[in-house]
């Protein structure tokens, strides 16, 4: 599978080199336009006809279908319930569809403050209340503000390319844009499965070439203690 060939490299440098060979835009693409408040894509960027026109080669199917979701920062203050402002953007099931969507939405460095961009397996909603996520938790990596673009891409490629030994445990990933830092998290299904969580955390650091310690928090603890929730596992 094309995407598997893309991300079999275990270092960020090797991965970056191979990505350019699969990405239709490559490294010579123009910079994204500036983002308006609460915007994730331009008016016509995700028009279905534009996406269809880009899929000119024989498609390379992914093992799972995935859905991008977006939480608009300008809508959050108007919602009484957490997660009520999250909306699906597009569901993709091939390598070509992934690149068509990825190249036409703003990357983390271009998103507005307090925006959240998700990529989850199809039919799994990025919410604690989703039955698949309810008993899970998350690994989190922190980046300086505006420096998470590569980490986000490498995380996406590792997930959709099924490069994690315990990939069945993964629900999806989210990048949170906050003041002073960006946070990328991988959500998993069974927080109590320590061996699986340890494997995911260790491999994720290898894919990102990330040397600092990262922590895993149970969703139940996050709901109870919010920002004061403590890490249960470390990698």
Swiss-Prot record:
This is Eukaryotic translation initiation factor 4E-1. EIF4F is a multi-subunit complex, the composition of which varies with external and internal environmental conditions. It is composed of at least EIF4A, EIF4E and EIF4G. EIF4E is also known to interact with other partners. In higher plants two isoforms of EIF4F have been identified, named isoform EIF4F and isoform EIF(iso)4F. Isoform EIF4F has subunits p220 and p26, whereas isoform EIF(iso)4F has subunits p82 and p28. PROSITE patterns: IF4E. Disulfide bonds join 133-171. It holds the Pfam family IF4E. Residues 13-24 have a biased composition (Polar residues). GO terms for molecular function: RNA 7-methylguanosine cap binding; RNA binding; translation initiation factor activity. The gene is eIF4E.
């Amino acid at each position: 599978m094309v995407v598997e060939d893309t991300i079999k490299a275990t270092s960020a440098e090797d991965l970056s080199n191979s990505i350019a060979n699969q990405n239709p835009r490559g490294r010579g693409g123009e910079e994204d336009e500036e983002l308006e408040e609460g915007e994730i894509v331009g008016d016509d960027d995700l028009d279905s006809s534009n996406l269809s026109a880009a899929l000119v080669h024989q498609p390379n199917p992914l093992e799972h279908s995935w859905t991008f979701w977006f939480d608009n920062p300008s809508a959050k203050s108007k919602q009484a319930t957490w997660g009520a402002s999250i909306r699906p953007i597009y569901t993709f099931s091939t390598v070509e569809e992934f690149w068509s969507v990825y190249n036409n939405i703003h990357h983390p460095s271009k998103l507005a403050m307090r925006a959240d961009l998700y990529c989850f397996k199809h039919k799994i909603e990025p919410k604690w209340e989703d039955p698949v996520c309810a008993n899970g938790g998350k690994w989190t990596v922190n980046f300086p503000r505006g420096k998470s673009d590569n980490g986000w891409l490498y995380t996406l490629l590792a997930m959709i390319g099924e490069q994690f030994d315990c990939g069945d445990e993964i629900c999806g990933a989210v990048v949170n844009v906050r003041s002073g830092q960006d946070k990328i998290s991988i959500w998993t299904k069974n927080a109590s499965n320590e061996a699986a969580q340890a494997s995911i955390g260790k491999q994720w650091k290898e894919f990102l070439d990330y040397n600092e310690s990262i922590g895993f928090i149970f969703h139940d603890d996050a709901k109870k203690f919010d920002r004061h929730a403590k890490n249960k596992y470390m990698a």
